[in-house]
């Protein structure tokens, strides 16, 4: 899907080098196509890296996507310049009167805090409430998934004894679901988190289904019955070197961090990572865009 991105967005250089099809605003304007309008709530501190990761996954289909990035006003970013946010981001107040075909809520490194103690929690709750009537389908990632399950369904998160860190094997638990069309019987996805949601809490809610899970990592993909909300507990969007960079960062900070499981060749950091989740990640996001956004959204928003 050609994505329409602003001129000079830092992600453009990386996407071009990776042969990901995107268009500048002028070319997109001259195409007689109604783009899918996707709002991306970027909660990650490394916003530019996350922009590239998300755009890479929504940029591989014949339809046109118009992404809108928003950041939370109630949190001051320490890792992204004010100039970048002004140039490439909106706030919720600026977009709340619009409707969107889809929404993506990223993860955030705040999982050890209670939801209510996150400084932008009230603002995020307003975004969640707004999405019920203004967004066709939302995909939530990692902490964003835990936050969405808590807000919409009252499902709590629990702290793990040690960080879940690595690439884990998953199996489908529901096969006749559009979101998982084309998935292998077994597939891999990265996880990097300190908290989890209990399977039994999800299963108690008749409006939710666990579509895929892992013996080691637990519930992975959860969907509401109508497909309006998708919750992905891992990080399918991660670059090949993301876990390695996290490992090096934590090690340099003197943390007692184990090497990420099933990630380095022969479990040897010197041999580098082996990417086993790229195909799954692309299929997950392309299925969501096609079956839950494009096929379901009203043509006129």
Curated annotation (Swiss-Prot):
Q: Where in the cell is it found?
A: Cytoplasm
- For the protein in the UniProt heading, the enzyme class is transferase
Which residues are tagged with the site Important for acyl-CoA specificity? Answer: 111
Pathway(s) it belongs to: Amino-acid biosynthesis; L-methionine biosynthesis via de novo pathway; O-acetyl-L-homoserine from L-homoserine: step 1/1
Q: What is its main location?
A: cytoplasm
One biological process term in Gene Ontology: L-methionine biosynthetic process from homoserine via O-succinyl-L-homoserine and cystathionine
Query: What is this enzyme's catalytic activity, as reactions?
Result: L-homoserine + acetyl-CoA = O-acetyl-L-homoserine + CoA
Single GO term (MF): homoserine O-succinyltransferase activity
Q: Site annotation (Important for substrate specificity): which residues?
A: 192
What protein am I looking at? Homoserine O-acetyltransferase
Q: Where does substrate bind?
A: 163, 192, 249
The record, for Pfam families, names:
HTS
In this protein, the active site sits at 142, 235, 237
Keywords attached to this Swiss-Prot or TrEMBL record, sorted alphabetically, are: Acyltransferase, Amino-acid biosynthesis, Cytoplasm, Methionine biosynthesis, Transferase
The chain's coiled-coil residues are none
Q: Does the keyword Cytoplasm apply?
A: yes
Q: Which Gene3D superfamilies is this protein grouped with?
A: 3.40.50.880
Known role: Transfers an acetyl group from acetyl-CoA to L-homoserine, forming acetyl-L-homoserine.
- GO cellular component entries: cytoplasm
Give the EC number: 2.3.1.31
* Membership in a protein family: Belongs to the MetA family.
């Amino acid at each position: 899907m050609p994505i329409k991105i602003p001129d000079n967005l830092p992600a453009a250089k990386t996407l071009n080098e990776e042969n990901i099809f995107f268009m500048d605003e002028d070319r997109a304007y001259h195409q007689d196509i109604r783009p899918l309008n996707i709002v991306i709530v970027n909660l990650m501190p490394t916003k530019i890296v996350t922009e590239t990761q998300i755009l890479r996954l929504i940029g591989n289909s014949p339809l046109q996507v118009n992404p809108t990035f928003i950041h939370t006003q109630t949190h001051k970013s320490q890792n992204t310049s004010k100039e970048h946010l002004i140039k490439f981001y909106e706030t919720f107040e600026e977009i709340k009167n619009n409707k969107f075909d889809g929404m993506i809520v990223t993860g955030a490194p705040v999982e050890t805090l209670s939801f209510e103690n996150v400084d932008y929690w009230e603002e995020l709750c307003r975004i969640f409430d707004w999405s019920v009537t203004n967004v066709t389908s939302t995909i939530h990632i990692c902490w964003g998934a835990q936050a969405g399950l808590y807000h919409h369904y009252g499902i709590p998160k629990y702290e793990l004894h040690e960080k879940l860190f690595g690439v884990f094997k998953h199996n489908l638990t529901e096969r006749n679901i559009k979101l998982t069309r084309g998935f292998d019987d077994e597939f891999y996805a990265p996880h990097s988190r300190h908290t989890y949601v209990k399977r039994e809490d999800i299963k108690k809610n008749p409006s939710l289904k666990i579509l895929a899970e892992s013996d080691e990592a637990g519930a992975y993909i959860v969907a509401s019955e109508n497909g309006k909300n998708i919750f992905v507990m891992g990080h399918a969007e991660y670059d090949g070197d993301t876990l390695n960079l996290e490992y090096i960062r934590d090690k340099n900070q003197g943390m007692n961090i184990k090497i990420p499981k099933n990630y380095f060749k022969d479990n040897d950091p010197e041999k580098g990572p082996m990417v086993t989740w790229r195909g799954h990640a692309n299929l997950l996001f392309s299925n969501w865009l096609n079956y839950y956004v494009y096929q379901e959204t009203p043509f006129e928003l």
